[in-house]
């Protein structure tokens, strides 16, 4: 007998069957509709952390058995991450706190070699893929259409119009407001045709579909573990090492150098020069465990089940009088499970409170860090 997809996937995640109190004193099983903001952990991730904790030690800083064990996990994890996202063999993996830090690292590195160049972002970006570029680059924004989809014609118009002066196009893989999935191969083709490079903010996309960096023409990819069932403060940046070689690191400190005198600093090679300080080894262990779990799943089955849920929920929401749905066309095949809506004359925070206090349903409300 084929197992119900809901049962199959729910059993992997910790805390989804916990009862929470309502305003009237009763209790219900909580519903996590705020997973786009952060996810609960996989049970396998918690087990991995529990099993690894007694063996945890500092990395790259000793020859003790536990230190060697921890260092091996940390370094071998880079290979797993590269394989997970289909990176080029020459790409490097930089461990980060989250997607935001990863993008800031790229922005810092590029400013040393892209003076006078332009960065293109889009009108559908999270602030993490907008603000880091503003202080060091001239910027322009690719428009979106009435459905919230990226306007590829406008992208080409701007790439052509800047006559080879665009250094980088920074675009989200999937919108954290509408869930719309960008066509990365089409974007990549245009970006490279006009001599630029492509950075993908993969925070919302990586947990939902397989990524093939080399095949899809992605030069830099950033993502967070806390959006892929490993909420323990880690993330990753994958990309070409060249831009990180001739720059000051984004964060300076121990572990990022080979030699220091009073008047000289010899920075280590990337990725190490961008990983100053004692790293979050437990967070990396959690990220790697989450990747192992995702690799065991049939992502096509996950996608099909997700699309069924999206269709079901949108169909129900359309029955509510006056509701405003965003990024929800009749056909929603190019979309992850994010549904944005408003109700007339009801403030968003009040809607969120009613859902939580009276229904046990957790949602994200507000601007989603995606203004202006």
Predicted regions and their residues:
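Pyridoxal 5′-phosphate
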Residues: 1-372
